[in-house]
């Protein structure tokens, strides 16, 4: 039996962390969560295969700053950004490998499978 690919979900809303966790797990991946609180986020020590990052973070820690922190900790893990926008926001584009509009779980799973492969 192989180990499932892990997806780290970063959001400031605990409800969104749970919802996206369910979607990720239903797709066959292991979900990890990191909640952004005002000006900090505690990233897990373990290796992750992909990072799912909410663009619309409240507080002092922006999605761009969070993406920079993610890059320094998980250099090889691609970042997939979630946003209410219709296209990827320009300021975060250099840090991420993909974009999914919020509210489309099927598209999210499709992008996860494209980026991680359907091995899980």
What are the language-model segments listed below?
Residues 1-8, 104-120:
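Non-catalytic signal-transmission and effector/linker regions of two-component phosphorelay proteins
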Residues 14-32:
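Two-component/phosphorelay signaling modules centered on CheY-like receiver
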Residues 32-50:
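Acidic, metal-coordinating helix/loop segments flanking the phosphotransfer/catalytic sites
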Residues 44-46, 69-76:
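Conserved phosphotransfer cores of two-component systems
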Residues 53-69:
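Conserved phosphotransfer microenvironments
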Residues 82-83:
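Hydrophobic/aromatic residues positioned on beta-strands within the core alpha/beta folds
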Residues 91-100, 104:
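As written
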